[in-house]
């Protein structure tokens, strides 16, 4: 199977390439091509010598054509970052760039396009959603942020190409993803773990819906080349945690003398992950968070101020 990936230098892309190359549970040989920017940090990708790297970006049509030529499946994980860029730049690169990518895929006659969207497409939630009727993939999309609007726009273009019979599409919508990033100090909850590891007191507010990067890459692998996933959307959510409770988990896990202060956040909108579970995606619950805290603490202890890992 020939597979192309955008966003390989990000957290999800980095973990996906490890899963596909080092584990490869598909049962068939994979030929992987990936799009990278010249300015991207790539030390963590040195181990994957068989990957065919294409230099370019979403704003470079020629590189998109080279990326998808001869490919069967395209994973679109890249998102041009904010908030330092203007809204005009973010829309131009992400929406227009993805349209160019989709058009290149049509011309290349790929078989499947997998887009990593986000649950931020739900800015407004219907009053019918409650614990007995959690928000699922059938809920209407009404973005309340620029990021959500960009993701929603791209989803619409994906369905346009599917319904015009250009290729199959599958959408993945994760909530906040935790996992080790190649630049580890950018990893989710890194600073809180770091402060408590040095016995500082921290003030925490709010709450978070979470899912591990392992569950996300499981989902991506399971939908890859899977005809049953054509036209489907999958919500990836493991659970909801108050940041005060998360802080206490960190204290208990790393034996910190730091103290936690603050107030609990809202309970959050109930969300369903039933479709992902039926796909076979496994979720590790709070035990997964504990293991992640241990791993980040170990990396902090091992690498100190050297926050970029070439082997991770």
Give names to the regions the model predicted.
Residues 1-26:
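N-terminal Rossmann NAD(P)H-binding glycine-rich loop of SDR-like oxidoreductase domains
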Residues 50-51, 55-93, 104:
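NAD(P)H-binding glycine-rich loop region in Rossmannoid oxidoreductase-like domains
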Residues 59, 89-100, 141, 145, ...:
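Glycine-rich NAD(P)-binding loop of the Rossmann-fold in SDR/ketoreductase-type enzymes
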Residues 100-146:
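Conserved Rossmann-fold NAD(P)-dependent oxidoreductase catalytic core, especially the SDR/UDP-sugar
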Residues 142-170:
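Active-site Tyr-X1-5-Lys
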Residues 159-208, 213:
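NAD(P)-dependent short-chain dehydrogenase/reductase
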Residues 207, 219-268, 272, 304-311:
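Mid/C-terminal beta-alpha module of Rossmann-like enzyme folds, strongest
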Residues 286-312:
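Amphipathic terminal alpha-helices
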């Amino acid at each position: 199977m020939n597979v192309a990936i955008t966003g390989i230098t990000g957290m999800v892309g980095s973990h996906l390439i490890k899963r596909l190359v080092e584990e490869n549970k598909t049962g068939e040989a994979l030929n992987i091509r990936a799009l990278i920017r010249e300015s991207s940090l790539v030390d963590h990708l040195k181990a994957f010598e068989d990957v065919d790297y294409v230099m370019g970006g979403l704003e470079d049509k020629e590189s998109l054509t080279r990326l998808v030529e001869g490919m069967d499946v395209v994973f679109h994980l890249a998102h041009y970052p904010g908030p330092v860029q203007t809204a005009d730049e973010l829309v131009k690169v992400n929406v227009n760039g993805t349209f160019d990518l989709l058009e290149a895929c049509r011309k290349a006659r790929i078989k499947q396009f997998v887009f990593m969207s986000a649950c931020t497409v739900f800015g407004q939630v219907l009053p019918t959603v409650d614990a007995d009727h959690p928000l699922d993939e059938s809920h209407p999309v009404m973005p309340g942020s620029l990021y959500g609007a960009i993701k929603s726009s791209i989803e619409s273009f994906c369905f346009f190409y599917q319904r015009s019979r250009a290729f199959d599409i599958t959408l993945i919508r994760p909530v906040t993803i935790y996992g080790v990033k190649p630049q580890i100090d950018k990893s989710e909850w890194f600073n809180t773990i770091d402060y408590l590891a040095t016995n500082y007191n921290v003030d925490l507010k709010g709450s978070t819906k979470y899912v591990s990067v392992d569950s996300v890459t499981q989902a991506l692998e399971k939908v890859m080349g899977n005809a049953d996933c054509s036209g489907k959307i999958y919500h990836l959510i493991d659970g909801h945690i108050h940041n005060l409770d998360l802080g206490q988990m960190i204290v208990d896990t790393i034996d910190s003398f730091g103290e936690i202060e603050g107030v609990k956040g809202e309970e959050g909108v109930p969300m369903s992950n039933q479709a992902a579970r039926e796909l076979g995606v496994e979720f590790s619950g709070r035990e997964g968070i504990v293991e992640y805290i241990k791993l980040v603490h170990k990396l902090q202890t091992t690498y100190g101020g050297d926050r970029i890992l070439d082997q991770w």
